[in-house]
Amino acid sequence: MNDFPWLTTVVVLPIVGGSLIVLFPHKGNKTIKWYTYCICFIDLLLIAYVFCYHFELDDPLIQLTENYKWIHFFDFYWRFGIDGLSLGPILLTGFITTLATLSAQPVTRESKLFYFLMLAMYSGQLGTFSSRDILLFFIMWELELIPVYLLLSMWGGKKRLYSATKFILYTAGSSVFLLLGILGMSLYSSNEPTLNFESLTNQSYPVALEIIFYMGFLIAFAVKSPIIPLHTWLPDTHGEAHYSTCMLLAGILLKMGAYGLVRINMELLSRAHSIFCPWLMLLGSIQIIYAASTSLGQRNVKKRIAYSSVSHMGFLILGIGSISETGLNGAILQIISHGFIGAALFFLAGTSYDRLRLLYLDEMGGMAIPMPKIFTIFTTLSMASLALPGMSGFVAELIVLLGIITNQKYLLITKILITFVTAIGMILTPIYSLSILRQMFYGYKLFNTPNSYFFDSGPRELFISISILIPVISIGIYPDFIFSFSADKVEAILSNFL
């Protein structure tokens, strides 16, 4: 059974299953929804089965490899494989997409197209994390752009077309740099074009050329991560998108950029990364403070959460730039942690909007009394976002900071400055998080206004919220579960920097 193409099945199942939605009757909304849930859940079960029975945790090498000749003309392979770096994002993708699909139940307009796009996006994201061919990586990277654009432009707020256009201009524009970098790396060979990740890992380049490649990939991944100043598409996109789409953006899409930085910039271009890592740490430090302080000035609750995501991604950039085992493990943990927390906060903001039809914080207030369940869950996940001990966010950010402090590559004054700046960001985080709670849930503004939408969480919403809360607490208490499959791969990546 080990020869069975498990990864191809996992990647292809959602988009193939989604293509069959066209066969359903036009008015079968409920049938289409349950069919989509089943596709996502079956795929998640397949991912869990492959992880439990076919993946060796103590093996840092690529496992479950699949290698099929696809296009003979230029030696292009359908090549998949996973290791400790890709396993966490794949599990996160399956989990968040399944819950995001369940959260999209209120969507009734053009539901066939909506659920097909979600499944197509699912396949693209899984393919990106599983690819072992750099051109296949690019194809999967681009595959999820079109579904996201259509989800943004067709289901969202009044300015959805503007935000969708801004999203596609940023991401498609940055993809040009990604494609040029891929073509340059694959063609720089004495014999024949090389697209295999394993071959590219052993490829050496002149320093100047490696820096050019590195900058091209950095621009592409900085847009998706996002890294300032290439982040401005994110608040507009989150502010207008349907909250199920926001869950996929915050939970998975942002993590693709961080994954690319580690998989390509660190693993394939280690010399250039050594040159750029101090600048990455500087950018990460500035990003934490800038995004946290900007979040305080946002009236729109979804934009405030979006800027908080940008701030938390700053810790991830710090971990990647630290070139230390502790720091990089912390960055990988932050990928998983923020994937859960960011998706949960956007889901709760969206469910509140379903009831109140309000997004501006200064128009809200008094929700705690009529909606105690939403209030309790929102408060708990806000505590996770501000890195409360016992939650996954605390462990991830603490480990990143420890990776910087214990790193011998940087001067003491540099470590003190970075720690001081990030500490300011960590002080600003509870200010904007608690401000959201105060403006939404306390006071009497809405409580004294008769409103037919004032009802608390139902079983579906409670199930989604608790399903995300459980791993947030579990990782906070026992982060070694994540480190058990990432630590060996991190050690292998950092061996290139010795």
Curated annotation (Swiss-Prot):
HAMAP family: NDH1_NuoM (MF_00491). Its EC number is 7.1.1.-. One of its GO terms (molecular function) is ubiquinone binding. Its main location: plastid. Pfam families: Proton_antipo_M. It is a multi-pass membrane protein. This is NAD(P)H-quinone oxidoreductase chain 4, chloroplastic. The keyword Translocase applies. One of its GO terms (cellular component) is chloroplast thylakoid membrane. It comes from Phaseolus vulgaris. It is an enzyme of class 7 (translocase). Keywords: Chloroplast, Membrane, NAD, NADP, Plastid, Plastoquinone, Quinone, Thylakoid, Translocase, Transmembrane, Transmembrane helix. The chain crosses the membrane at residues 4-24, 37-57, 80-100, 112-129, 134-154, 167-187, 208-228, 242-262, 272-292, 305-325, 330-350, 386-406, 416-436, 463-483. It comes from the Eukaryota.
